[in-house]
A protein has these predicted regions:
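C-terminal, low-complexity/hydrophilic appendages and adjacent surface loops
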Residues: 18-21
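Short, structured beta-strand segments at or near domain termini in extracellular proteins/domains
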Residues: 293-304
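Short proline/glycine-enriched turn/loop segments at secondary-structure junctions
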Residues: 251-255, 284-291
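Acidic-aromatic/histidine active-site loop/patch
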Residues: 39
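A short N-terminal beta-strand-loop micro-motif at the entrance of redox/enzyme domains
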Residues: 25-31
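Functional-site microenvironments in short loops/helix caps that host divalent-cation chemistry
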Residues: 3-4, 10, 14-15, 59-280
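An anion-binding catalytic pocket shared by soluble metabolic enzymes
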Residues: 34
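Short capping motifs at secondary-structure boundaries
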Residues: 31, 46-55, 137-138
């Protein structure tokens, strides 16, 4: 594992998406972090050792999804599909579909498998799946503050994990989307989907893929409203853990009472024209029960 030294840093951003504000001073203790996201091979070892069944492989409870069509209550997960041309990017159903049978073993559905993807990040894992793996490995998932501090790699004020220039010297530093989203990906960075973990340079703490490739689970409940900044570094909150669970429910879907966690880092689907979230400050809300083809995780070990 890689050592993350801890310290006081400026979390969030006032220059991008509203849910990233306010930029504020926060302190985290030192800890250890997996240098790479958990791979398919590593997750398979966990399943083989424990017999664990992921959330995407279990039947759904109709009471949790009022009004859902019966075909959407069979085990499965959300799968990205490239569109045939330009679409309304305000409607994610244009490129996300619930696919019965999709799970970590079959990321795109029953016709897919993990052949040649052993060293790719495991996806289609819900929050419960990630925490189960972490417990088996003797580890935990990071808080949002821990994750963001680690992602910055010592570059507290930089926009990206590696600095302020997105393509330094024309070099791709992360697995993101190049081209008009979601209908054409030029794959100029070498990958149209997930990439093997560690395909791009590490940050200052020796951590790979802290931007792009796959979003990563954290333990914090999501709220679009963050605490205000403090007047002095001496007053910075120490090891914050986010709001209460009740704050995380989606106000746009009041009938669905599935809480949401913060995911960080962006993914191979993030594009400058649509989702410019391949930055340390970026964050997104994710329902805890939902696996998707662009969400994975990595673990931490905190000092005793």
């Amino acid at each position: 594992m890689a050592r993350v030294p801890g310290g006081t840093f400026r979390m969030g951003s006032d220059r991008h998406y509203r849910e990233e504000a306010a930029s504020r001073l926060v302190t985290v203790d030192p800890f250890w972090m997996d240098p790479r996201t958990v791979t398919n091979t590593e997750f398979a070892a966990f399943v083989a050792a424990t017999g664990y069944v992921t959330v995407a492989e279990r039947p759904l409870n109709a009471a949790d999804y009022p009004g859902a069509k019966p075909e959407l209550l069979t085990p499965g997960a959300l799968v990205f599909h490239m569109t045939e041309g330009p679409v309304d990017t305000g409607d994610i159903s244009n490129w996300w579909s619930y696919v019965p049978g999709a799970c970590w073993r079959h990321p795109e559905g029953l016709g897919s498998d993990l052949t040649g993807r052993g060293d790719h990040p495991v996806v289609q894992v819900a929050f419960e799946d990630a925490t189960a793996y972490a417990a088996w490995a003797g580890k935990e998932l990071p808080s949002e503050a821990e994750w963001e501090f680690a992602a910055r790699g010592g570059l507290d004020a930089a926009e990206f994990v590696w600095g302020d220039e997105f393509l330094p010297g024309g070099r791709h530093m992360a697995n993101t989307w190049q081209g008009p989203f979601p209908w054409r990906n030029f794959a100029a960075d070498g990958f149209a989907g997930t990439a093997p973990v560690g395909s791009y340079p590490p940050n200052g703490y020796g951590l790979y893929d802290m931007a792009g490739n796959v979003w990563q689970w954290t333990t914090d409940w999501f709220s679009a409203v963050n605490p205000p900044d403090v007047a002095s570094p001496c007053c910075a909150p120490e090891n914050p853990r986010g709001p209460a669970m009740e704050a995380s429910f989606d106000p746009a879907q009041p009938r669905i009472r599935i809480p949401r966690k913060v995911v960080k880092g962006g993914s191979f689907l993030c594009a400058p024209s649509y989702c410019r979230r391949y930055r340390p400050a970026a964050r997104h809300a994710q329902m805890v029960d939902t696996g998707m083809s662009h969400i994975g995780f990595r673990c931490v070990v905190r000092d005793a």
